[in-house]
């Protein structure tokens, strides 16, 4: 299609491949493209994947065992074991999750220095009908995620919240990903969700008749972060053997005089 411009009356210029124009108060012509495009600038990356199989008997039995050893959380209960991915029964699930953590790092962050995100803590959440997950973030973590062991895709959701101060508050006629303060996604059994650890999230009171079970985890970085030229260089060495210092609600130090230890 030709993009030549043509002269019209009063020496006004319009583009021949633009379908509509509007006359301003100055009698000049302002061109408008037929289909304007709104770009998403600096969007928050939330990754969804799905385990391509059912959970094995060994995995199910391990989860059942953990359900008998729980501690009270705000709104629900969590496993006493805070490193469930270190157990051999979940080795295959850990590999599945690590694959997508690597994918997230490559496709989203795309670092050129040798750096990787590895799983640190991992724990199980048990949410009975009518219970909830309080609104929270995951400090001391880079990417966080959830693998759903038992969830109803028709009723179970995860809510995310926009971070930062809202300068102007306008009543909204039609919610979208630009004007919303929160956004939710349905989740089901075998779904995996990855997101930046700073992103605030929560679960409303569950409506399902079954116990919602999810496996949450954190990650951190290992390798060469930043660069010397920009004075941001940081070398994070080999990961720590967490089995040597893992603490649970049972074996952690008790409150001491003057505060908690």
Residue ranges and their predicted role:
Residues 124-194, 204, 221-233:
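Catalytic core of non-heme Fe(II) oxygenases with the double-stranded beta-helix
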């Amino acid at each position: 299609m030709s993009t030549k411009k043509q002269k019209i009356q009063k020496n006004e210029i319009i583009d021949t491949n633009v379908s509509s124009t509007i006359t301003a108060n100055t009698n000049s012509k302002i061109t408008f493209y037929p289909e304007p495009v709104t770009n998403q600038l600096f969007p928050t990356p939330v990754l969804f994947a799905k385990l391509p199989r059912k959970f094995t008997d060994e995995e199910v039995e391990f989860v059942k065992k953990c359900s008998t050893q729980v501690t009270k959380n705000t709104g629900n209960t969590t496993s006493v074991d805070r490193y469930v991915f270190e157990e051999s029964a979940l080795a295959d699930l850990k590999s599945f999750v690590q694959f997508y953590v690597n994918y997230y790092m490559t496709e989203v962050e795309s670092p050129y220095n040798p750096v990787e995100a590895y799983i640190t803590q991992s724990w199980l959440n048990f949410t009975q009908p009518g219970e909830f997950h309080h609104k929270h973030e995951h400090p001391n973590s880079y990417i966080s995620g959830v693998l759903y062991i038992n969830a109803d895709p028709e009723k179970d959701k995860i809510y995310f919240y926009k971070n930062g101060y809202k300068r102007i508050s306008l009543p909204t006629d039609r919610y979208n990903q630009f004007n919303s303060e929160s956004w939710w996604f349905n989740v089901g059994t075998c779904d995996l969700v990855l997101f930046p650890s700073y992103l605030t999230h929560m679960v409303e009171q569950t409506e399902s008749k079954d116990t919602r079970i999810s496996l949450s985890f954190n990650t951190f970085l290992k390798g060469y972060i930043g660069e010397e030229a920009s004075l941001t260089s940081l070398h994070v060495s080999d990961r720590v053997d967490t089995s040597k210092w893992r603490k649970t609600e049972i074996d952690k130090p008790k409150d001491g005089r003057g505060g908690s230890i």
